Amino acid sequence: MEKEGVTMVINFEELHPNERAELERNIFFSTLEQLKGWARSNSLWPMTFGLACCAIEMMGVGSSHYDLDRFGSFFRTSPRQSDVMIVSGTVTKKMAPIVRRLYDQMPEPKWVIAMGSCATAGGPYVNSYAVVKGVDQIVPVDVYIPGCPPNPAALIYGINKLKEKIRYEAKTGKQVTNK
């Protein structure tokens, strides 16, 4: 009989192998950091922030054909409710301070995905005096998605890579950088 308020301590070495196998199937061992990483990776809220043609592909991810909601990601319109910024399109030098301000308004922890060749490296406008040669010059980027424009499946793949990165960092305690 187990009494209320009594904590049981089980020594695994004293258990029969069948009992040990049963306990291992039904007990989940983890650290708080790993649980937080798992929860964060499965509930990403990207901010809708499209600057050019890649934004059309980003909108496609929310359609019924791809349905990003089934992965636990819900688009938010406010940076204060978002934890992922998806920069999709050409970032001009005039737009750069706004991108930085939106990034600064996001709560911690926060991540950035650069979607398309314009956000990644300037795209076809790379030699223009008015274009930033990659959004990573303004904010730290966690995942790069190549293409002009990348299709919605590529964006879903990039979001899944970000989820893997979040879980890995929570599990190991090591920061993964792109440089």
From Swiss-Prot:
Record-linked Gene3D superfamilies: 3.40.50.12280
Q: Which GO terms describe its cellular component?
A: plasma membrane; respiratory chain complex I
Major localization class: membrane
Fetch the InterPro entries from UniProt.
NADH_UbQ_OxRdtase-like_20kDa, NADH_UQ_OxRdtase_20Kd_su
UniProt-annotated location(s) = Cell membrane
Residues that, per the record, bind [4Fe-4S] cluster: 53-54, 118, 148
Q: List the disulfide bonds.
A: none
* Keyword vocabulary terms for this entry: 4Fe-4S, Cell membrane, Iron, Iron-sulfur, Membrane, Metal-binding, NAD, Quinone, Translocase, Transport
The note on the cofactor says: Binds 1 [4Fe-4S] cluster.
The cofactor required is: [4Fe-4S] cluster
- Give the UniProt family note: Belongs to the complex I 20 kDa subunit family.
Describe its partners and assembly state. NDH-1 is composed of 14 different subunits. Subunits NuoB, C, D, E, F, and G constitute the peripheral sector of the complex.
The protein's name: NADH-quinone oxidoreductase subunit B
State the species of origin: Bacillus thuringiensis (strain Al Hakam)
